[in-house]
Structure formats: structure tokens, C-alpha cells
Amino acid sequence: MQSISSETESVSNQLPRQVGEDISSIPVISQPLTPGDMKSGLFLLTENADTVEIAPGVLGSNPLGISKYPNGLAALGGDDYVRGSTDPEAMKGNQGNDTIEGQGGNDTLWGGQDSDVLYGGTGDDLLSGNLGNDYLFGDADNDLLRGGQGDDALVGGAGNDTLIGDLGVDRLWGSEGADVFVLRTDTATPPPVDCGCGNVDGLDEITSDFILDYNSVQGDRIGLTGGLTANDIVLTQKTITYGDRRDYDSSGPLPLGQIRTLDFQIESASVTVITEAKTGNVLGLVKGVSPAQLQFVSFSDSI
């Protein structure tokens, strides 16, 4: 899909770092910063704001397949910046607004209690925002992204990714590859007055997950849970009007720290509203495509 704004770069090139942030001198550590019970299997940082890179071979398995810290890293308190190695690693943000970068390997990253930024890097990664309004970037390879609670922004990046907003009003970008956007039946919202939107001051309120770069040519699909199939839903094409148009740009969310020059600008867009036929509840919105372009797949509730 074409970008609404020429001010943005391709979503696949965006990194979840503050613009101008210097991380060239970040310390590389191989020992926990807080002593812990070895039975916990956790590599602990501190209750403060830590900025660290994990040395290779610390969280990953040794040649015998044994890891000294099988439960991964826990950042504890503070607004942390944690960068992993090329190993497959598990890292948890816990409290604070954390940034966790997996780099290489098949990583598992959890945000924790606040508003976090998770960046998978290369490898088939699992990213889970948990609480707060999180930014999740899968980047290369085939990733699974879950927003958790809060209003999250999920970007798959290159590869065939699976994006699940979970609770909250989430924005989903698959980027390159054949992606699956999962709309959970148990998080659907009651039908508003105008099929997806209540009107306030001439603007439509977005109350459901919003898929912003669905691409049928690349093989994107909508995942349905709760035993629903394409026969159990209703597709309605509508035009909606919203403010802060940069938040809904098909090229992806604005990289953190950049000046948001398109905030407060109003835009109208054609969307397909997906509702459950039996209840009328809204499962989600898809920007810029007609109902005929959408393909659906049943998805397990045990995800």
C-alpha cells in the first residue's frame, strides 16, 4: 500500500530507538548486576535504569545445550535499555519504560508493566508487550508479536509474521511478507453507533484493532479465533475520519523521538469493518482494502 505521508521512511528500516541516542559506548556485561538465587535461573539487573549489552554465551546455551540462566534476564526496575547478543535469549523488562533489543537468534522478549519498546532483530522471535502502550518491532524472519494489555503498535517487518493485538485498541503493520493479523473474538468491542466509530466533533472514534497495511498480493490473511470462519462475519466498507493522521499511516508508526509534524491533521480513509454476525461486535478495521480483497484463516484459541 502507498504511504499517506512522504515524510516517513519504509517501516522495515525503522528502529525503536530515540533519534540521536548514542549507544556506541554501552557496557557489555557477562555477570548479573544483582546477586540472585541460582535456583531461579535468572540473570538479574538492578532496580535502577540500566543500559547494558549482554555478552555472547551468557544467556544462550553452551555447546552441551545447557544454560546457566534458563529463565533468561530480568531487568527489574527503572527505564532500562538492554541489548542482547547473536544468541537466542529470553529477556524481561519488568517495571519501567524499557527498550529491549534481541539482535540475533530466536529471542523471547517481554515488556513488563509499563510502556516498552521491543525489537526482535534477526531470527524467529516472540515479542510480548504485556502491560502498557508498547511498540513491538519483529524485524527480519518469521516473528510472533503480541500486544497484551494497552493500546499497542505492532510492526512485523520482513518475513511471514503473526500479529495479535490482544486487549486495547491496537495498530498493526505487517510490512513485507505474508502476515497473519489475528483478531480475537474475546476482545471484540460492542457495536458502536456507526459501524466501528462513535462521532465526536466530526471525528470517528477508533474503538477496535486497526490493520493498516494489509496486502493481499503478498498473501496477508486475517486470523479468526473462537471457532469463527469467514461465514460467521460481516464485512462492511465505510469511510471514517480521524485526527492525528500520522498515527494511522500505512508506512508504519513514526520512529520514537522524531517530531510529529502531522499530528492534529484530519484525514478520511476507506476501511473494511469486520464484525461478528451473531453478536454485531466489531473485531477490527482494515484500512484501504475492499471486502473482496480479504482472506481469512481460523486460528487456535490456545495461542
What residue ranges belong to the model's regions?
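Acidic, glycine-rich calcium-binding repeat modules characteristic of RTX/beta-roll
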Residues: V58-A74, D79-R83, D87-T239
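Low-complexity acidic/polar repeat-biased segments
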Residues: M1-K39, K238-I303
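A generic structural signal for beta-strand entry/edge sites
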Residues: T51, G219, A269-V273
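N-terminal segments that cap or nucleate solenoid repeat domains
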Residues: Q2-A90
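Generic structural detector for well-ordered beta-strands
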Residues: E53, F210, G223, L285-K287
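Short, surface-exposed beta-strand/loop "edge" segments at domain boundaries and coil↔beta transitions
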Residues: A49-T51, M91, P190-P192, A230-I233, ...
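Generic beta-strand structural signal
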Residues: E47, G84, E176, E267-S268
